[in-house]
Amino acid sequence: MQHISSLARKLGEPSKSVDMTQGGICRTILAFALPIMIGNLFQQLYNMVDTAVVGRGVGPEALAAVGAASPVTQLLLGLLIGMTSGMSVVIARYFGAGDEARMKRAIATGALLIGAIGIAVTVAGALLCRALFEFIHTPEDILDGAVEYAAILFLGAVATAAYNYEANVMRAFGNSAVPLLFLIVASLLNVGLDLLFVFPLGWGVAGAAIATVLSQLISAILCLAYMARRVPQVRLARSDWKWDGALAAEHLRTGVPMAFFSSLLAISFLILQSALNSLGSADVAAYTAASKMDTLVYQVMAAFGTAVSTFAAQNYGSGSIGRIREGVRRCTGITVAVCAGLTAFAQLFGRFFMLLFVGPEDAGILASGMMYMRTTSVLYVVLGFNYVIRFALIGVGKSAIPMLVGLSEIATRAAVTYLLVYRIGFAGMAFASPACWVTSTILCGLCYAPMMRSAEDRLRAAPAASAWPGFREVIALWKGWSL
């Protein structure tokens, strides 16, 4: 632990806080995004290790149970990650504008707000968990396992909320390396606890869930201890802890759309999961394994999205709209290249990826999973463009548009589910995500230019820190694309 603290101190020196309003754009974005990307992948490692351990150590039914629980648990994680990411945009904006007093009040108010949200999520999850799984027609042979796994994760929601808020506060200052370090430590601990609880102790899916919660809690404690000693921006006075309704509203204006966006996958996948459950536990297992590749791509793109939103927020605070536009162009090129590489990996090595979760004797599950992976991976490039544009709009305060686009994703996935999955079976699952990516990316592309012009006009009219637009801009956009 002493070595970890020493390394954290080195990573957290003031030079590690990134001022994204100056310097090379690509270098700045990549330096900021890479630690977040690795962190996102390690965060996803929690669920992937749970899935792999129960799949290979317990059996296909346990794999299907964790898979059936995945949309519900991802809804929890997406809500908390999105909300805390949105709060970090507010903090980054005041950091970029040099308003230290308001920045500290924003940190304190955000902590109170996310704590209340974490408690509410825990209570709601504990009360509604079984009813939700029954509502989406979870097969009887995996129902108890899915409920048990999800309920334990809901009980650990406060720890998850605490870690993600602490990490995103540091990221708002440009320090993404220290949160990554603590997340890696906790992820490796999760691997060890998973192996211990599932194999020697035989706790099954419950053991995998308990390992995840304990690991998240340790990650939160490590991060908080480091911040208390080494991050001067969070040394708050008692007066900073006074509830500020205006700042809470700002947090919600950015946090709710990002939470909604981060939860969209889970919300729309709940619709898809209901149809998938009707196909039986074998198809649930195939989808659970194959869709992990999609999830990894989402996490990589989310890292670029977080970097772009922070880049846009800091530069909006300093009045540099031109730099934001150039950053979006360059980041788009980077994500296209990265997504092309991920597509090649899925096409060439998909079978080896599937074998992490199921044995070679499960030939039917392997075949279905490979068909799914080879179909969806073709359009990963579209997904990358989508994330860059959407998060750039959030970074400059145009959060209503991403929410509108998110609703289109839910509608598209629901349509594909009822038009294809219920008619042609598992093959229809492979078209649901690509259809969402295409429709939402078209909408993002249409909205980007007028929304950036609106941000520039608002910047000229008033200080950037004073105004965040609302849904009236959506109406104005519909009336004539005149913003």
Show where each model-derived region lies.
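Short runs within selected transmembrane alpha-helices of multi-pass transporters and secretion channels
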Residues: T84, I152-R171, P179-S187, A208-C223, ...
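Interfacial/gating helices of multi-pass transporter permease domains
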Residues: V54-Q74, D141-G145, V205-A206, L247-T254, ...
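Small-residue-rich hydrophobic transmembrane alpha-helices
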Residues: L63-V123, T160-P179, A286-G350, L383-V405
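N-terminal transmembrane alpha-helices
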Residues: M20-G57, P71-G86, V90, G115-T122, ...
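Short alpha-helical transmembrane segments in multi-pass integral membrane proteins
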Residues: M1-A33, I91-V158, P200-V256, A312-L379, ...
